[in-house]
Structures are given as C-alpha cells and as structure tokens.
C-alpha cells in the first residue's frame, strides 16, 4: 500500500487514462503559453498520495516537428471532480538539475513572481524591513510533501541598493498552504557547484527511501540484516548529479547503531549508487561529532558570523566590524551547533574571535552561546590542541578549583589550589581542557594535571582525569608511567583488551593483574599496559595498546601481543607506525651511546627512519636511524633486545648501512624473501588477483622482496606461481599500514615464464 507522501511507480502501458491526463496537461500548457505542443506517448507515470492523487507523468510531445520529453504534475480529487495541472516542464534539454531539484524554465512567470513577493512580504513583516521585489534570477523546485521552491531573487533594500536574496518556500497547493522556510541575503556571488547544504526535513519520504536503498545495498554486499529506523541528518551536494550525505540510525542484531552513507543520484538517468556506507558508532551522530565545513565564507556562514558580531556589539556596547570567517565547524546537537573562528576589526585593529552559535532551523531559532577574543595571531595548535594565552584568568582558575574539589571529594584528600601553569583546549563534543597546575598537599607544593570536559550549552562539566605529574609535567606525545597500574580504571582497560583478544582469536585468557601502565597524550589517550593473564592454566605476560577518547565514549585495542613467555617462537616483524615516538627515540639514543662507548666513537643521534619489532622472549627492535659522524649524516641499523618486565635492554647489533639506503622513499632489498611474513603477503596478493580476475594461480615461492618507507610500507615482491600447472613469474606491489590493519594490492602483473 502506498505511503502518504511517497512516490510510487504506476504501470501505464495501454492505459488510456494516462494518455488522457497527459493530453489534458498539454492543452493546459498550450493555452497558457500560446504554444502548439502535440502529445505523442507516455513514457513514465508516478503517483503520490496527497489530499487526492498527484500524478507525475513523463511523456513525449512534438513542437515544430522536434520531439522532446516533458514532465507534468497533475492533481486529481475525484470526489470533487478536480483535475489541475500543478507543474509542467521540459526535461529533455538538460533543464533537469541533479538530485530531485529541477530548474524551472521561466523564473519570472506570474506564479513565481508572486511566490517571491510573498517571501519578501513575509521577511519585511518579520524583520520590519522594506525590501522591494525587482525580479527572479533563478527558480528551482523539489518534490517534498508538496513542493519546495528555491528562488534566487533581486530586491532593493532601504537604501535603494540592489541585492541578491535566496528564499525557500514550501507549498502544498491542495491545502492552500504556503510557508517561507528560509530567506537570506546571498550577495553578488551565488553559491557555486560543490557546496554542501543541510536538508531541512531529513525524514521526508524521499530521504528515508534513499537511506533504505543504502541499507539494502549494504545488507546484500555484507550479508547482514540491518533494519532502518530513522534519518538523523541529511546534507546534499551538487556534483554531476546530487550527492546525499545521510546520517541514519539502524538496528543490528537488536542494537540501535549510527551509520553514515553517501549516495550519488542522477535522477534524469534513473541512476542511484551507494558510494560509501560505514558504522559511525552508537551515539557519534547525536550530541556528538564535530566536522569541518568546507566553505567557511559561504553566505550562510558569513550571515551567522555577522549575527554573532551584532549580538556581541549589542550586549557589550562594542563596535566590532565583521571581516571574514577563518574556520567553521558544525556539530549535530538538538539542531546544529556552529563553531566559527572569524576576523573582525576593533577600532581599526584586526583581531580573531571565536563564536558558538546554536541553530534550530525548523523553529527559526538562533542563539549565540559563546563569543570571545582568541588573540591577534591565533594560538598555534598542537594536533587539535590550542594553547590558552591567560591560564590564570578567573574562568580557568574556577575550572581547576572545580577539579580539585571533585578530587578531594572522591579521594578524601585535602589539596589546596595554588595557580595554573598551563591550559590547553581541544574542540571535541564541547571543549576538553588540559590544565597543568600547582596545588599543595600537606603543605608541600606539587604539580598536577587534570582534564575537564565542558559542554556550555548543556551546563555540563566533568573531570575526565586528575593525576600527580611531579615537577616535569609530561608534554603532548610523551609517554609517562602511571603510578598505580592496578587501580580499577586500568584493570578495567586491561580486561577490555583481554576480552577483545578472546573474541577475535577465539581464546580463553583470564586476566590476573597489571604489571605496568604507561600513557601517551595523542588525539585522546594511548595506554600501554603490560599485564599478566592465564592461558590454559599457565601465567603469561602480554602487552596491550588501547586508544581511548573518553568524550566520544570511544575505546579501541590497537595491539595485543604475548611478550613474557620464554616458549614464544621468534615471530613476524611488525612495522611501528610512529618511529619517532619518544619511546623509540630513547631506544635509538641508547644504542648510539652503547656504540660510542664500545668503539670510542662520537656519533650524534639525529632521528629514526624506520622501526620494526619482533616478538621473541621479550621484544627485538630493528631501528634504522640517522646519526652524524664528524658532522656527516649517515644511516645505521640497530637491533635492541628489550624485556620490559625485567628492566632489561641490550644492543644486539649496530652497523653502518650507508648514506641513503634507508631514507623515506628509498627502496631497499629484504634479506629473507621467504620469511613467513613475506610469503603471507605474496599469498594475499595472489588471492586478491584470483578473486578479481577469476584466476587459479597457486603461490610457489618468493624470488625477491624490496621495501620502501611511504605512509606505511610499500612491498615490491617478485614471486613464482603456477597457472594451470605452468610456473610463471609475477610482480606485485602491496601497501601495508600495520597500525590500521590495512593491506592493499596496488599492482599485480605477469613478468615472464619461470621455466625460461
């Protein structure tokens, strides 16, 4: 049964009623436009249940012997004997614009001029303005529950100056309903192709149908059973067609989750393709993720910034003048929260400000939540972190006191706040403050670090972390030891890692205790936990790396490995994603110092180029590093054996490689091409080729392996494989990013016959 508002295809072959309806529409058009179209045949019929039936008929007609396609919209109410042509347009001459939104051929016909005047009158009444209509520049229409008209028009303002405006007008003709949804100043530069715009009614049947289509495609590809619930947000972008960005809720095995999909639509070709479909999280698209807006100076965002500046001027009796937007971020809350960094002049001096503006478009609601001076040259960011220039301003002292009070209450402690030493902030779902401060404990001054999560618009404040740092507060990116590895927070993290491992590997480890915990400030926090777990009744030592973003309720096991069992077989080599992480720089420096001492040399460490690790009874690190020898840069390789639980560290090998053999981008030969790691890579490439080409190659052996440091590692493998029992030589290129568990065959080709 047809859903109210939904478009449904109607079988039309050999049905005289649709021919008659099309002829009726042609006669109506000819009469109104003094034309001489001749109806030929119906091509397509859709219907929509409104207060009656709306028919969308696509048909062929000729004029002056030229055959073209037209579309007519005809409203029928049989009980009133009503038949009315609501829309009529040419669709065969590229007049159809992408995405369900179509250009109207005569923007200044009486009907559209009246709609534009209606929008201007509505604006004048609401804003006590005196705009006067001049002309329509462009009209587009979109089928919603009714018709949405997008009119770009020229009007003169109070000063007699001609300006460009955009109006969105929603019309339900059968109900005699007309509403101005939006009216705004555009300026002389109308938004260009490629801009992403919010769609006002994400659960309009059209967009629900698109979301259901994406879910069906995903279910079919992945053999899953998602069930659509609702759309949370829809954005659209004019491309060669229309790209829809839909955030939706769906049920997976009874659990509600959030997904994002990108759907490309070319309506005039009846083309629809799911470009992307991915899990976002259980709540990442609710009060949640902050995303960058691609065009911060689009008229919409400039208007928002001007609104914030005006609001500030009114409340502070100031005289700021808006210049431009520098950055715009948006966040889906109950409506949309915009974070705008803007430039404005104050008494002629250009300064930077930050504004937070809450918008609920469907209620015509707009409120400035926050407006503040950032500085004359905006603070440099450290990976999304911004230094706050005045750490002891009352606002930040109050935040710290709040954290100290909370800590005292939780720990039955008696810290007394002294002063803030440093404040950083990070835009998350709200703001995360990283405050380093001094406080006295039993009369002794100590250094602490706290993380406080604030959502101003919800009056929400939470201490995410509070810890003793000491006199050398850990810097961003540095790895620091945690003093109490078995506190409940870290035991819970370790159990989470063990459970994750058990699930993935079908194992049965049982957590016992933590031996050591380190943490590193990244975009969130990276925890390095050395733990004891029981495997088949035997105690073993494992290492887990867990990435936590508390403000997103995000927790992911990056790595879990056995390190402490002497029976462990020497294993595969693993690339380390961040070779210049302080931990690995310290190891490289240790190796250089050891070499200098043994050889009475004077090498000076510069940087790491590559780090690999190998699971043995402990860990062997293979570090390719740069050091200077008598002022000349050279490349060295070091092998360092580490057993962290014994505080054991030994340089097993240190040697000169060359002046450039290990530079990023340089290709080097791997000494053991048939080690299991490289055989596995070659098999992966062969399987990928077989799947794509419907081939039946069988891997035999590797002949040669080269590797190249890129954003990850590129492997160039020459291998032998049999094809219909004939041995041949192939070359493959495989990109590996171990830390993302990413592996992709870039190239696979036949080189020659192995028997020759």
Swiss-Prot record:
<keyword id="KW-0646">Protease inhibitor</keyword>
<feature type="site" description="Reactive site">
    <location>
        <position position="288"/>
    </location>
</feature>
<feature type="domain" description="Cystatin 4">
    <location>
        <begin position="286"/>
        <end position="380"/>
    </location>
</feature>
<dbReference type="GO" id="GO:0004869">
    <property type="term" value="F:cysteine-type endopeptidase inhibitor activity"/>
</dbReference>
<comment type="function">
    <text>Probably has a role in the plant's defense system.</text>
</comment>
<keyword id="KW-0789">Thiol protease inhibitor</keyword>
<keyword id="KW-0677">Repeat</keyword>
<feature type="short sequence motif" description="Secondary area of contact">
    <location>
        <begin position="614"/>
        <end position="618"/>
    </location>
</feature>
<dbReference type="InterPro" id="IPR000010">
    <property type="entry name" value="Cystatin_dom"/>
</dbReference>
<feature type="short sequence motif" description="Secondary area of contact">
    <location>
        <begin position="237"/>
        <end position="241"/>
    </location>
</feature>
<feature type="domain" description="Cystatin 5">
    <location>
        <begin position="381"/>
        <end position="474"/>
    </location>
</feature>
<dbReference type="InterPro" id="IPR018073">
    <property type="entry name" value="Prot_inh_cystat_CS"/>
</dbReference>
<feature type="domain" description="Cystatin 7">
    <location>
        <begin position="569"/>
        <end position="662"/>
    </location>
</feature>
<dbReference type="Pfam" id="PF00031">
    <property type="entry name" value="Cystatin"/>
</dbReference>
<feature type="domain" description="Cystatin 6">
    <location>
        <begin position="475"/>
        <end position="568"/>
    </location>
</feature>
<feature type="site" description="Reactive site">
    <location>
        <position position="477"/>
    </location>
</feature>
<feature type="site" description="Reactive site">
    <location>
        <position position="5"/>
    </location>
</feature>
<feature type="site" description="Reactive site">
    <location>
        <position position="665"/>
    </location>
</feature>
<feature type="domain" description="Cystatin 3">
    <location>
        <begin position="192"/>
        <end position="285"/>
    </location>
</feature>
<feature type="site" description="Reactive site">
    <location>
        <position position="571"/>
    </location>
</feature>
<dbReference type="InterPro" id="IPR027214">
    <property type="entry name" value="Cystatin"/>
</dbReference>
<feature type="domain" description="Cystatin 8">
    <location>
        <begin position="663"/>
        <end position="756"/>
    </location>
</feature>
<feature type="site" description="Reactive site">
    <location>
        <position position="99"/>
    </location>
</feature>
<feature type="short sequence motif" description="Secondary area of contact">
    <location>
        <begin position="708"/>
        <end position="712"/>
    </location>
</feature>
<feature type="short sequence motif" description="Secondary area of contact">
    <location>
        <begin position="520"/>
        <end position="524"/>
    </location>
</feature>
<feature type="short sequence motif" description="Secondary area of contact">
    <location>
        <begin position="48"/>
        <end position="52"/>
    </location>
</feature>
<protein>
    <recommendedName>
        <fullName>Multicystatin</fullName>
    </recommendedName>
</protein>
<feature type="site" description="Reactive site">
    <location>
        <position position="383"/>
    </location>
</feature>
<feature type="short sequence motif" description="Secondary area of contact">
    <location>
        <begin position="331"/>
        <end position="335"/>
    </location>
</feature>
<feature type="site" description="Reactive site">
    <location>
        <position position="194"/>
    </location>
</feature>
<feature type="short sequence motif" description="Secondary area of contact">
    <location>
        <begin position="426"/>
        <end position="430"/>
    </location>
</feature>
<feature type="domain" description="Cystatin 1">
    <location>
        <begin position="3"/>
        <end position="96"/>
    </location>
</feature>
<comment type="similarity">
    <text>Belongs to the cystatin family. Phytocystatin subfamily.</text>
</comment>
<feature type="domain" description="Cystatin 2">
    <location>
        <begin position="97"/>
        <end position="191"/>
    </location>
</feature>
<feature type="short sequence motif" description="Secondary area of contact">
    <location>
        <begin position="142"/>
        <end position="146"/>
    </location>
</feature>
<dbReference type="InterPro" id="IPR046350">
    <property type="entry name" value="Cystatin_sf"/>
</dbReference>
């Amino acid at each position: 049964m047809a859903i109210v508002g939904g478009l449904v295809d109607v079988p039309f072959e050999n049905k005289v009623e649709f021919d008659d309806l099309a002829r009726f529409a042609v006669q109506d058009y000819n009469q109104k436009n003094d034309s001489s179209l001749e109806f030929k045949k119906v091509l397509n019929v859709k219907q929509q249940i409104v207060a009656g039936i709306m028919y969308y008929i696509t048909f062929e007609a000729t004029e002056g012997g030229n055959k073209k396609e037209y579309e007519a919209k005809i409203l029928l109410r049989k009980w009133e004997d009503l038949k009315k042509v609501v829309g009529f347009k040419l669709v065969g001459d590229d007049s159809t614009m992408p995405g369900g939104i179509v250009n109207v051929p005569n923007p200044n016909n009486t009907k559209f001029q009246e709609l534009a005047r209606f929008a201007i009158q509505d604006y004048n009444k609401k804003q006590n303005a005196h705009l006067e209509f001049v002309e329509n520049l462009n009209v587009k229409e979109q089928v919603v529950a009714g018709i949405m008209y997008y009119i770009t028009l020229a009007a003169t303002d109070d000063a007699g100056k001609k300006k460009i405006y955009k109006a969105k007008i929603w019309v339900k003709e059968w109900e005699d309903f007309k509403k101005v949804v939006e009216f705004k100043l555009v300026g002389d530069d109308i938004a260009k192709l490629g801009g992403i715009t919010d769609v006002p009614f994400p659960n309009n049947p059209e967009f629900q149908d698109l979301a259901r289509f994406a879910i069906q495609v995903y279910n079919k590809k992945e053999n899953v059973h998602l069930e659509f619930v609702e759309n949370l947000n829809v954005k659209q972008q004019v491309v060669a067609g229309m790209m829809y960005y839909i955030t939706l809720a769906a049920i997976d095995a009874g659990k509600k989750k959030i997904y994002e999909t990108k759907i490309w639509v070319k309506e005039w070709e009846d083309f629809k393709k799911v470009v992307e479909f991915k899990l976002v999280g259980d709540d990442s698209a609710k009060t949640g993720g902050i995303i960058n807006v691609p065009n911060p100076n689009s008229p919409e965002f400039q208007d928002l910034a001007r609104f914030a500046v005006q609001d500030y001027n009114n409340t502070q009796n100031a005289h700021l003048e808006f210049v431009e937007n520098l950055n715009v971020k948006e966040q889906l809350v109950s409506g949309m929260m915009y974070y705008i960094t803007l430039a404005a002049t104050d008494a002629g001096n250009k300064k930077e400000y930050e504004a937070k503006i809450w918008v609920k478009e469907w209620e015509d609601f707009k409120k400035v939540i926050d407006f503040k001076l950032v500085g004359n040259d905006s603070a440099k960011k450290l990976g999304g972190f911004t230094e706050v220039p005045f750490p002891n301003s009352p606002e930040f002292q109050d935040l710290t006191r709040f954290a100290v009070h909370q800590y005292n209450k939780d720990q039955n402690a008696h810290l007394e706040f002294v002063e803030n030493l440093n404040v950083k902030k990070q835009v998350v779902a709200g703001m995360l403050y990283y405050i380093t401060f001094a406080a006295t404990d039993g009369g002794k001054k100590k250094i602490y670090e706290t993380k406080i999560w604030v959502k101003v618009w919800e009056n929400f404040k939470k201490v995410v972390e509070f810890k003793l740092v000491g006199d050398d507060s850990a810097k961003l990116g540095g790895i620091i030891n945690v003093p109490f590895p078995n506190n409940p927070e870290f035991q819970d993290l370790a159990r989470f890692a063990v459970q994750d491992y058990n699930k993935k590997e079908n194992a049965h480890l049982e957590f016992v205790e933590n031996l050591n915990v380190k943490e590193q400030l990244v975009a969130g926090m990276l925890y390095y936990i050395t733990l004891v777990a029981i495997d088949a009744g035997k105690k073993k030592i494992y290492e887990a790396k867990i990435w936590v973003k508390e403000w997103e309720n995000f927790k992911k096991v990056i790595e879990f490995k056995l390190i402490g069992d002497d029976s462990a077989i020497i294993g595969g080599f693993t690339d380390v994603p961040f070779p210049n992480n302080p931990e690995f720089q310290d190891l490289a420096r240790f190796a250089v110092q050891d070499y200098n001492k043994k050889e009475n040399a004077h090498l000076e460490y510069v940087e790491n180029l590559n780090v690999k690790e190998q699971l043995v009874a402990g860990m062997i690190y293979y570090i390719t590093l740069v050091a200077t020898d008598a002022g000349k840069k050279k490349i060295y390789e070091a092998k360092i054996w580490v057993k962290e639980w014994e505080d054991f560290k030994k340089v097993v090998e240190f040697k000169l490689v060359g002046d450039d053999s290990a530079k990023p981008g340089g290709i080097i030969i791997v000494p053991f091409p048939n080690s299991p790691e490289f055989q596995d890579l070659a098999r992966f490439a062969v399987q990928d080729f077989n799947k794509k080409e419907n081939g039946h190659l069988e891997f035999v052996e590797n002949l040669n392996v080269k590797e190249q440091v890129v954003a990850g590692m590129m492997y160039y493998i020459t291998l032998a494989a049999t094809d219909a029992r004939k041995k041949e030589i192939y070359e493959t290129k495989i990109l590996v990013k171990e830390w993302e568990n990413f592996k992709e065959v870039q190239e696979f080709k036949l080189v020659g016959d192995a028997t020759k």
